[in-house]
């Protein structure tokens, strides 16, 4: 695979909102260059050209793969296109960053894992874009938990109260058939963070949710938008840890968009974003002993849409490539994050607890 002694040459497949986010991050990192990009949408290609005019533009990613000498390919297309594009990319001698969710359902993810196994190359890094674990407050919270401050972790609560889904090219994100559903498309990030903190496998899911406020009057080509906009999801892990997600996508009037709370036998830790606050409260110290710290990325980190997390994700992946390390966010991580989301949607539909083994097959 790639030599660590030269600049990494990147090709981007899909240069909509997230693809351009990747470009902005990569042009700010030394030792790499975006040399080509591909997108079927002319407006998206024009937007990418304004960022990297020197890169070659393609309307067909297959032509880009055939014509360019690439080291890394980033797949940032709509979710339902991930699997088929991955099948083509993995046949090339390149490292791969594939955006979340890995696939729109578990079956797709399992197929992609098997395809990668069949095309394994020494030193190849295949990385899933679950970058929320790199947000500064979240990363600090994880480090504090790992240090043992909490004692034995028992409860993980994540709240995301935010704005509705943004408008995307051809409105692809208005339909669950394209996204996998809100709890896959959006919330795979949080199920990944939960699993990372719990250090255990999710075993069951119970959820309640609906589409109550957003996109109710949106109809495209005769089909009405069907993406839910609020939910509660409870996840039980094999080691006894419990996780809970509280999602509202009509809660713009919130001081923080994301709040993570981990409670253990010795302490409680909270991470608040975008306030960039981490709180640690030890049981022995009570309410008056809660310590609050401002935690933010260093000034050299490109903030972008995710508080610098996407930038740090690329830095971590490049370090893995150059040092011959394994991926920090694996296809298996991507699979589990999708499995919990898919289980949550099934739980809502059938009003019952769903075992992860049912979903994984």
What are the language-model segments listed below?
Residues 1-52:
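N-terminal Rossmann-like dinucleotide-binding module
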Residues 122-124, 132-225, 351:
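Predominantly a Rossmann-like dinucleotide-binding segment in NAD(P)-dependent oxidoreductases
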Residues 1-4, 17, 31, 72-74, ...:
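C-terminal helix-rich "cap/oligomerization" subdomain common to oxidoreductases
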Residues 54-61:
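Conserved SAM-binding strand-loop segment of SAM-dependent methyltransferases
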Residues 65-67, 72-79, 83-131, 148:
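Beta-strand-loop-alpha-helix segment that lines the small-molecule cofactor/substrate pocket
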Residues 20, 83, 188:
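Residues forming the Rossmann-fold NAD(P)(H) cofactor-binding site
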Residues 21, 40, 302-314, 329, ...:
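Active-site loop of classical SDR/Rossmann-like NAD(P)-dependent oxidoreductases
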Residues 191-277, 311-323, 361:
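Contiguous beta-strand/loop segments that form the cofactor/metal-binding neighborhood of enzyme cores
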